[in-house]
Design a protein with these regions (language model features):
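Long, compositionally biased intrinsically disordered terminal regions
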Residues: 121-166, 183-186, 192-198, 203-205, ...
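Hydrophobic, aromatic-enriched, well-ordered structural segments
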Residues: 1-11, 193-200
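Extended alpha-helical scaffolds
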Residues: 60-180
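Conserved SAM-binding loop
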Residues: 219
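A short catalytic or substrate-binding loop motif that flags glycine-/basic-rich loops and adjacent residues
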Residues: 1, 208-213
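Short Cys/His-based metal-binding microdomains
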Residues: 3-60
Length: 378
């Protein structure tokens, strides 16, 4: 086994130090540290630096020139807001240009148009909207004009909200910054009261954007009946910090990120439940599901996905489409990338079934299914 890579970043000066052989700085290891700090602060703990870091600091202090007028944290925050505002203004120009050209003409220019716009937003410290544009670039030929129009509409709503952010409530302002990609410090979240409950792992989503892998884990509280979302990131092939197997349960407190309709949480000290989980009650009607989704949007219009537990629904073929049918005869389509329809059909045997899914306002992405032996991947 080779020697472990030693990598460190000094955030105040942007100095990267790494023992790898890469000639370019910052290297992949330094960038991975920055991405982890930005998107997965719960994976970072505060401790005294190891000896090799202190030796690097000592050498730097001996050779460093005096630094004056270091900007305070508030000044750096205002500088970032100014940079983000310039990115929002550029995004508005691009969206207005797309509106003039039309979606069909924009699509004819290929996905590089969206990728270039996403790169500019990333430079402006707006990774949230940049991710929306990258997903548009990755839709490929299966993407519809309706999907693109909706995504662009969400981005324009973000632009209008950003221009009037001073008029928003504190919670709405926090959610706007979270959508933009500005994360709340882990310590600040943990200082808020936690919600104690018995939590069941209902579904897991894994994905990747360039070399950064992400994971969404949905939990549901037995007593509170609230959903909690855990978001993890890992660079390259590195494993996630903790495993969250489907259908396992944990006792403990989750701490929600600030917001008027909070979903994302931190679960600092989960304890294996070791007992049955009770209390799953779901929608039998898509009408009721949509009504509650619309209520949620009135609190937080930036909901990327909405967790739903459905009962007495059936996967069927309807006019050559693969859909889900509720007790009232209403149908809803599956997510374009969903590939396990025939698995659902086999599990249901043509009869009613229960499943957990993410809903985006138009389509469902099943994540797990209830069987006689419990929850299984959907």
């Amino acid at each position: 086994m080779g020697k472990a890579i030693e990598s460190a970043v000094k955030l105040t000066t942007g100095k990267y130090v790494c023992s790898c052989r890469a000639r370019q700085r910052p290297c992949a290891h330094g960038l991975a540290l920055v991405l982890m700090l930005k998107n997965a602060q719960e994976r970072i703990s505060v401790a005294q630096p190891p000896a090799w870091v202190r030796s690097v600091q000592l050498l730097a202090e001996k050779s460093a020139k005096p630094v004056t007028n270091v900007p305070a944290a508030d000044d750096r925050f205002e500088e970032r807001l100014a940079l983000m505002t310039s990115g929002v203004e550029e995004l508005e120009i691009r969206l207005l240009d797309i509106a003039r050209r039309g979606i069909a003409d924009t699509l004819a220019q290929g996905p590089d148009l969206f990728r270039a716009a996403a790169a500019r937003l990333t430079d402006a410290k707006l990774p949230g909207p940049a991710g929306h544009l990258r997903r548009l670039a990755n839709l490929g030929p299966d993407g519809t004009e309706a999907q693109i129009a909706r995504a662009l509409g969400d981005l324009y709503l973000f632009i209008r909200a950003w221009k009037h952010k001073e008029e928003l409530s504190v919670k709405q302002h926090d959610e706007l910054l979270q959508f933009a990609g500005m994360t709340t410090r882990k310590d600040d979240i943990l200082r808020q009261p936690g919600l104690q409950d018995h939590w069941l792992v209902m579904g897991v989503v894994n994905g990747q954007e360039e070399k950064l892998r992400f994971r969404r884990v949905w939990l549901r509280g037995e007593k509170s009946r609230r959903f909690a979302l855990l978001v993890d990131y890992a660079f390259g092939e590195r494993p996630f910090e903790r495993a969250w197997p489907l259908a396992t349960s944990f006792d403990g407190k989750v701490h929600y990120y600030p917001g008027s309709y909070p979903q994302r949480t931190i679960f600092p000290q989960p304890v294996p439940g070791g007992r049955p989980y009770d209390g799953l009650v779901g929608y039998t009607s898509f009408t009721n599901m949509r009504a509650n989704y619309q209520k949620a949007l009135t609190f937080n219009p930036w909901l990327y996905s909405y967790p739903v537990y459905l009962q007495e629904v059936r996967p069927v073929k309807h006019d050559h489409d693969k859909v889900l049918l509720d007790t009232e005869g209403e149908v809803i389509h599956f997510h374009a990338g969903y590939q396990n329809f025939y698995t659902l059909l086999a599990i249901s045997g043509g009869g009613p079934m229960s499943l957990f899914a993410e809903f985006d306002g138009y389509q469902l992405l099943p994540l797990s299914v209830v069987t006689g032996s419990g929850l299984v991947d959907g």
